[in-house]
């Protein structure tokens, strides 16, 4: 086996596999290390949101996943905003995660990724760009050289002091055999809010039905550890959607895992980065953990590819800035979304729900801890992101007024041009972007076209019809009109008078 690699990826879940496949596409020599002895390994987290399809397309992995069992098109029965049960369409899918992961491992091996399993990371020595990685295998210790190390070990990657954590959550789950529910049982996904937690259930491709109860273990003493089966059955019995399952047999005894959301303040270290749940873990209420893990892995790969191939320290710093900004943005948006969803629960006045109705993260670090500064910086960045999310609201009224095609408009005076790190192709570059109070983040590209060069025509008053013509060299007239309508709807352009002073764009 080769002893020199560009990248060592530790962990063969969706995040690690996505990174390994993408790094391989970019020409890196990749070693994938997986600790699990049983393979394919059983997993929870089978829900796939629609965005996963685009990621699979990018990885050119559709053929490899053709035979993976998947269940899609099932409705969701929901009891959340009120005690009434509603049925809604559901555009996600449930996949056999063991088969999903195994298919991607086979694809990675077929493309030249070296795979060690079962194997585990023992230690990393050396310096950024020149690591000596010690790995424990069934045949003894193995040492390899690597430019960079990517940690995709999920919650098993424990450096908890630097993690900012949301209020505690644990999840209990069990599976009901198909024979116990009968041939005519509905296969709808179910989501139910209870005063002390929430339940989720979904049919699996195997025919089994999985039920899960997510709750705060700190509110229950040691009961979850002592009596997991009793706790899960009682939750079912109290649920309007799961009551019929309270007495059904289970395939195995219930399992329990930690499901507290968090973000790691040391996710980026020079030449060593974290992916997926090792970097930040979502609240399971989103059912989007697989997509978020894979998408963030793609962003991390671009940052690390830039860092490894940078010609100077400024380019490496830009790569880090890109990674950390995407980490903060992804985590902050999810924490804010989760808090908003918790606020909607019909039982929202109970302590479980009140404690999660606003984004709250704590670290438990002492002020003089050496990690405190990193945690403080991360906290400030998250708070700034939350503040921006909070102030960005749709324009007042049911809908924005129509773009006045025959009246002059120009760029609003509170629009600014800023320079931000952007992914273009497989590298991070500094790129000009439009910033405005009505945007939740700077926008560098619109419909695949660099936006800032298009704004020059808007620095002085002009008619929209004329602007559509002047933008014709960069895009189709229909796209130009959509751009102007979008800018108008966001109040980024405003009514103007001919001869008015030009609006600065820098």
Predicted regions and their residues:
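Beta1/beta-strand and adjacent pyrophosphate-binding region of the FAD-binding site
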Residues: 2-15
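Glycine-rich FAD pyrophosphate-binding loop
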Residues: 24-44
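Conserved N-terminal glycine-rich FAD pyrophosphate-binding loop of Rossmann-like flavoproteins
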Residues: 37-57
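A conserved beta-strand/loop capping segment in the N-terminal third of enzymes
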Residues: 53, 57-103
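Predominantly flavin-linked oxidoreductase catalytic cores and closely associated redox partners
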Residues: 107-246
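FAD/FMN-dependent oxidoreductases across multiple families
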Residues: 221-309, 314-339, 345-347
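C-terminal helical "tail/cap" subdomain of flavin- and related membrane-associated enzymes
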Residues: 305-400
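Acidic, low-complexity/disordered tracts enriched in E/D and polar residues
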Residues: 373-457, 481, 485, 494-506
């Amino acid at each position: 086996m080769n002893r020199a690699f560009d990248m060592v990826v530790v962990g063969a879940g969706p995040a690690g596999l996505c990174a390994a496949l993408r790094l391989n596409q970019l020409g890196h020599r990749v070693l994938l290390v997986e600790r699990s002895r049983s393979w394919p390994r059983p997993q929870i987290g089978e829900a796939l949101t629609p965005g996963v399809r685009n990621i699979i397309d990018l990885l050119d992995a559709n053929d490899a996943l053709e035979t993976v069992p998947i269940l899609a098109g099932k409705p969701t029965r929901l009891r959340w905003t009120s005690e009434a049960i509603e049925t809604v369409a559901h555009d996600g899918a449930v996949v056999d995660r063991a088969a999903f992961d195994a298919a991607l491992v086979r694809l990675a091996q077929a493309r030249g990724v070296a795979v060690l399993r079962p194997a585990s990371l023992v230690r990393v020595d050396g310096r950024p760009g020149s690591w000596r990685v010690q790995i424990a295998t069934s045949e003894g210790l193995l040492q390899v050289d690597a430019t960079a190390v990517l940690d995709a070990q999920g919650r098993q990657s424990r450096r908890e002091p630097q993690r900012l954590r949301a209020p505690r959550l644990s999840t209990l789950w069990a599976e009901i055999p198909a024979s116990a529910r009968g041939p005519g049982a509905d296969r709808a996904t179910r989501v139910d809010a209870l005063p002390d937690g929430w339940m989720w259930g979904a049919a699996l491709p195997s025919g089994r039905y999985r039920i899960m109860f997510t709750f705060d273990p700190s509110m229950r003493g040691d009961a979850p550890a002592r009596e997991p089966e009793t706790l899960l059955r009682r939750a079912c019995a109290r649920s309007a959607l799961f009551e019929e399952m309270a007495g059904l047999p289970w395939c195995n005894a219930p399992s329990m895992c930690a499901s507290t959301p968090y973000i790691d303040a040391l996710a980026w270290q020079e030449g060593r980065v974290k992916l997926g749940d090792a970097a930040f873990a979502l609240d399971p209420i989103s059912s989007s953990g697989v997509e978020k893990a894979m998408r963030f892995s793609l962003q991390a790969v671009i940052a690390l590819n830039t860092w490894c191939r940078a010609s100077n320290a400024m380019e490496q710093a830009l790569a880090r800035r890109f990674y950390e900004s995407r980490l903060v943005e992804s985590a902050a948006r999810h924490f804010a979304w989760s808090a908003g969803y918790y606020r909607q629960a019909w039982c929202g006045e109970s302590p479980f729900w009140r404690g999660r109705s606003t984004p709250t993260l704590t670290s438990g670090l002492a002020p003089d801890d050496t990690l405190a500064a990193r945690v403080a910086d991360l906290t400030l960045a998250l708070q700034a992101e939350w503040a921006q999310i909070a102030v960005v609201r749709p324009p007042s009224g049911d809908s924005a007024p129509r773009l006045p095609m025959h009246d002059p408009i120009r760029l609003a005076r509170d629009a600014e041009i800023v320079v931000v790190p952007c992914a273009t192709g497989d590298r991070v570059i500094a790129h000009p972007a439009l910033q405005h109070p009505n945007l939740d983040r700077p926008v560098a590209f619109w419909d695949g076209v660099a936006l800032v060069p298009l704004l020059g025509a808007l620095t002085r008053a002009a008619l929209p019809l004329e602007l559509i013509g002047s933008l014709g060299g960069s895009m189709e007239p229909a796209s130009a009109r959509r751009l102007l309508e979008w800018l108008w709807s966001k109040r980024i352009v405003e009514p103007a008078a001919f001869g008015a002073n030009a609006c600065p764009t820098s």
